Swiss-Prot record:
EC class (word): transferase
Listed GO biological process terms: NAD biosynthetic process
Gene Ontology molecular function terms on file: ATP binding; nicotinate-nucleotide adenylyltransferase activity
Protein name: Probable nicotinate-nucleotide adenylyltransferase
NCBIfam families per the UniProt record, alphabetical: cyt_tran_rel, nicotinate (nicotinamide) nucleotide adenylyltransferase
Lineage: Bacteria, Pseudomonadati, Chlorobiota, Chlorobiia, Chlorobiales
Enzyme Commission number(s) of this protein: 2.7.7.18
Organism, scientific name: Chloroherpeton thalassium (strain ATCC 35110 / GB-78)
């Protein structure tokens, strides 16, 4: 059965931490494709990039990733929907497109810890295998395993010092941030003066 990995997020902006997650997923699971699904940020403010720029930067990210391996795709399905999408709705969408593929849903440890609060979480476990990325040394794996069968998730430890929120602040403050992402994305941010309103 072919595998399709799904990364959801605003990627606002994309950085080398996102690249590390994608390349590690490729190495561990050998998916036929990795889909970057751009989602709306319910906490979006003036400091965030407009959705058109989020999509453009995600496409640049996919182009850079595509130089190193299998096909990387960008989906704007969630952006085009009215309102905000729940993860289960996104999974149903991709399952309808690829009914014979195994979906790998890549999430962070923070979301894993509150997984039982997600809408239709039991159906999520039926539609997808969870790939949980956690910082090395954390002990959170046991805390939610009571509701997630061990065969339905894989725990991956990886240290990622970068965060998009920190990058937005550094850009606004004029710090040295360009080396934390590919030059094509840094050039897009500079050309359009993104993240200048972060406080």
């Amino acid at each position: 059965m072919k595998k399709i990995a799904l990364f959801g997020g605003s990627f606002d902006p994309p950085h080398y931490g996102h690249f590390a997650l994608c390349t590690l997923t490729r190495e561990l699971f050998s998916p036929e494709k990795i889909i970057l699904s751009i989602s709306k940020n319910p906490l979006k403010g003036s400091a965030n990039a407009p959705e058109a720029h989020q999509l453009a930067m995600a496409k640049l990210m996919a182009e850079e990733l595509g130089k190193t391996g299998p096909v990387f795709e960008v989906s704007d399905w969630e952006l085009r929907r009215a309102g905000f999408s729940y993860t289960i709705e996104t999974l149903r969408h991709f399952h309808a497109i690829e009914p014979n593929a195994e979906l790998l849903l890549c999430i962070g440890e923070d979301n894993y810890q509150i997984f039982e609060k997600w809408k239709a979480y039991q159906e999520i476990l039926q539609l997808a295998h969870l790939v949980v990325f956690a910082r090395s040394g954390t002990q959170g794996e046991q805390q939610s395993s009571r509701i997630i069968p061990p065969e339905r998730y894989t725990w991956v430890q990886l240290d990622l010092p970068l965060s998009s929120s920190d990058l937005r602040r550094e850009i606004a403050e004029g710090q040295d941030w360009q080396a934390k992402m590919p030059s094509s994305i840094a050039a897009h941010i500079a050309a359009h003066r993104l993240y200048q309103n972060e406080k």
